Amino acid sequence: MKIGLMGGTFNPIHMAHLRIAEEARELCGLDRVLFIPVADPPHKPLAGEVPFHQRCQMVRLAIAGNRAFELSEIEGQRPGKSYSIDTIGTFREQHPQAELYFIIGSDSFLELGLWRRYADILRSCNLIVVERPGRQVNDPLSALPVDIRGELRYTPASRSLEHVGGTRVHFFAGCLLDISSSEIRRLAATGRSITYLVPPQVEAYIKEQRIYSECP
């Protein structure tokens, strides 16, 4: 079984998140894609301090009806900061025979060297790096810290990095939807429409709960 892991604050989840997950599922033949809201982001504070349960509910509403998409609340079940390597490790224990694919954006890949135990992430699962318009990764090896480069080989034809342990990093230019959660929060806070930026059921929930009514 191939399982995609897509983490994020999902504050809120929007149409580009869903499209990225669908393109990744199709590209790598994933059987399932798990959406994993971050409980306590390790690198920057959560904008607006939207509670974990509300962000989970927005994801739940957004993916309803898609049998390949699932919500995982695993990071809300652990104390402390939400580190990706811990989440990957838990799924590895739960699904020892599965192929895991960690889905991230190209901006996150370019900062991977700042992540906790980034080398173990590359060694323990496959990565799908989604390149947004204007954010291409032209030289993947050079983007990584020197101490890990010797374990990887880049194949231009397939646009992938192969780790000596067998895992791969796949790069693809996906999702032309240029949508940001921060812009959605700004629009919602000022009473502007967010229709077609988020699924209708998510928009209704945001309005009902007044989630971003006081967001900066």
UniProtKB/Swiss-Prot annotation:
Q: Which GO terms describe its biological process?
A: NAD biosynthetic process
EC numbers on record: 2.7.7.18
Q: Which GO terms describe its molecular function?
A: ATP binding; nicotinate-nucleotide adenylyltransferase activity
Q: Which SUPFAM superfamilies match?
A: Nucleotidylyl transferase
Q: Could you tell me which pathway this protein works in? A: Cofactor biosynthesis; NAD(+) biosynthesis; deamido-NAD(+) from nicotinate D-ribonucleotide: step 1/1
Asked if the record carries the keyword NAD, the reply is yes
Query: Entry's InterPro entries?
Result: Cyt_trans-like, NadD/NMNAT, Rossmann-like_a/b/a_fold
Q: Which UniProt keyword terms apply here?
A: ATP-binding, NAD, Nucleotide-binding, Nucleotidyltransferase, Pyridine nucleotide biosynthesis, Transferase
Leader sequence residues: none
Keyword Nucleotidyltransferase assigned to the entry: answer is yes
The reactions it catalyses are:
nicotinate beta-D-ribonucleotide + ATP + H(+) = deamido-NAD(+) + diphosphate
Tell me the protein family, please.
Answer: Belongs to the NadD family.
User: Per its database record, what is this protein's job?
Assistant: Catalyzes the reversible adenylation of nicotinate mononucleotide (NaMN) to nicotinic acid adenine dinucleotide (NaAD).
Q: Which PANTHER family match?
A: NICOTINATE-NUCLEOTIDE ADENYLYLTRANSFERASE-RELATED, PHOSPHOPANTETHEINE ADENYLYLTRANSFERASE
Stated name of the protein: Probable nicotinate-nucleotide adenylyltransferase
